[in-house]
């Protein structure tokens, strides 16, 4: 029985991983479609589309899926949905601020799913503007270290408009104004430095430190929100101390 139980558990875990992978692929494809619709279907002349395609490729999205999404967005093929971007605001456990970015073809469904995820996981919705002011839109580029030093990265991107380089342990995070994102990304490429992702993101201006129990609750809320097909990104101002992060990895 123990063998069967272990197999069943493994099968369940694989199903969960496959489901999450499928959701991630769908969200990356949606980004490509919207970027192509907004700025045209040529990645060379549409930096947002270029970055959306690069992110999808690095996440192993099949090239055929990427190309079909690009064509749907640009109008070369029929079948693209009327995607709308909506941002919802709220608070999670311990007063952690939460911004939820949705890309949906059904506003009512998106609002309902976000509200249910929030209320079932210790959060509550907030009025527009009551949370957003705690975040600033920034350009964010992440790259693996690969024997690079912080000085190497700074030297490559400082003149291109980078504001900060953060050491995340196994990787670096470069922060810039959204308008400088393409210039910073291009500077990395010119220096022969590969990067994982480049995108506009919300960065918190004030963070809320949490203990292990609160961190688990907030991450459970984030998981529930990200489980919605309409949710593209979830941003919080949670600050997880190193000892709490280490304990979370053991969960």
From Swiss-Prot:
Entry's Gene3D superfamilies? 1.10.10.200, 3.30.70.980
Main location class: cytoplasm
Q: Which residues are listed as membrane-spanning?
A: none
Q: Which example biological process does GO assign this protein? A: regulation of DNA-templated transcription
Highest taxon of the lineage: Bacteria
Give the UniProt family note.
Belongs to the TACO1 family.
What is the official name of this protein in its record?
Probable transcriptional regulatory protein Mvan_2570
């Amino acid at each position: 029985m123990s063998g069967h139980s272990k197999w069943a558990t493994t099968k369940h875990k694989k199903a969960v991983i496959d489901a999450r992978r499928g959701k991630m692929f769908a969200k990356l494809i949606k980004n490509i479609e919207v970027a192509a619709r907004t700025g045209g279907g040529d990645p060379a002349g549409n930096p947002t589309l270029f970055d959306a395609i690069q992110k999808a490729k690095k996440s192993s999205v099949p090239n055929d899926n990427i190309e079909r999404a690009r064509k749907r967005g640009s109008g070369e093929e029929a079948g693209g949905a009327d995607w709308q971007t909506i941002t919802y605001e709220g608070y999670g456990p311990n007063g952690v601020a939460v911004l939820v970015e949705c890309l949906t073809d059904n506003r009512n469904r998106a609002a309902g799913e976000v509200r249910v995820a929030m209320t079932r996981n210790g959060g509550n919705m907030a009025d527009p503007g009551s949370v957003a002011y705690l975040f600033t839109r920034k350009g964010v580029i992440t790259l693996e270290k690969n024997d690079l030093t912080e000085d190497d990265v700074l030297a490559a991107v400082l003149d291109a408009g980078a504001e900060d380089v953060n050491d995340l342990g196994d990787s670096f995070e470069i922060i810039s104004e959204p308008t400088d994102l393409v210039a910073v990304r291009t500077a990395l490429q010119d220096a022969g430095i590969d990067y994982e992702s480049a995108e506009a993101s919300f960065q918190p201006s004030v963070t809320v430190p949490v203990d292990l129990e609160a961190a688990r609750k907030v991450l459970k809320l984030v998981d529930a929100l990200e489980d919605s097909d309409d949710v593209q990104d979830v941003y919080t101002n949670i600050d997880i101390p190193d000892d709490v992060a280490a304990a979370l990895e053991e969960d």
